Design a protein with these regions (language model features):
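Aromatic-rich transmembrane-lumenal/periplasmic boundary elements in polytopic membrane proteins
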Residues: 1, 153-196
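Short hydrophobic/aromatic helix or loop-helix immediately within or flanking a transmembrane segment
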Residues: 1-26
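Loop-to-helix entry region of an early transmembrane alpha helix in multi-pass inner-membrane enzymes
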Residues: 19-42
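Aromatic- and kink-enriched transmembrane "portal" helix at the membrane-lumen/periplasm boundary
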Residues: 25, 29, 33, 65-90
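Transmembrane-helix signature of polytopic, membrane-embedded enzymes
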Residues: 47-71
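Membrane-interface helix-boundary motifs at transmembrane edges
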Residues: 52-60, 103-109, 139-149
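Specific aromatic-rich, kink-prone transmembrane helix
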Residues: 87-104
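Membrane-interface alpha helices of multi-pass inner-membrane proteins
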Residues: 108-140, 152-158
Length: 196
């Protein structure tokens, strides 16, 4: 479900290990807080710019609506809890802003732009990729359904990320799941032996 997320946070894990070796303290809360603060701040900035530059409402109204978005408990929690929701929110709001600018200027999302947005957002959570395709559909209109665009911007990236996600699951996740399952069976068998 999160094909590139572990690779995106891997440098933060290395930094935490390095700082732990140097200081003897686990500083993961502070290390994770920095990107979360960045993503939350720029989510606010881009949602404000969507209201202001694309929807063209007044500055005060844009500020109130942006603040209202961040007053919702789900958004507040996403901004402080170390999970992928704040990252997804930033990426989707950023992609929505880009799509809005393209629609406003009468231009289309090119194949490479769609693929780049798809890989970055779907790499965090696969369902985000579908949202990028919806953005591209509204931005490009009927041209979204051109064979070249469908093949190179939709089907090929979807197949590539699916193959990568399956490889990642079989390589990193499945062996750990099997080991946990075997350990559970072994412990269950030992418990049964003790009872009899």
């Amino acid at each position: 479900r999160h094909p590139f997320l572990s690779f995106m946070v891997w440098p933060l894990s290395l930094l935490d290990g390095w700082l732990m070796d140097m200081t003897g303290l686990n500083l993961v809360q502070f290390i994770v807080a920095v990107p979360l603060l960045f993503f939350a701040f720029y989510s606010f900035i881009f949602i404000f710019r969507i209201f202001r530059d694309i929807i063209k409402i007044r500055r005060f109204e844009a500020m109130v609506l942006s603040a209202m978005l961040f007053s919702f408990a789900y958004v507040m929690i996403a901004a402080v809890v170390p999970d992928h929701f704040c990252v997804s929110m930033f990426l989707l709001v950023f992609a929505l802003y880009i799509s809005g600018l393209k629609m406003q200027n009468g231009t289309r999302l090119s194949i490479w732009q769609t693929v780049l947005l798809f890989f970055v957002t779907a790499g965090v959570t696969l369902s985000n990729g579908v949202k990028i395709f919806i953005y591209a559909l509204f931005t490009n209109g009927k041209k979204f359904f051109r064979i070249k665009y469908l093949l190179l911007a939709v089907l090929l990236p979807s197949a590539l990320i699916w193959v990568f996600a399956r490889w990642e699951y079989r390589t990193f996740v499945l062996p750990k799941e099997k080991a946990r399952h075997e350990a559970r069976l072994k412990k269950s068998a030992e418990t049964r032996q003790k009872l009899f």
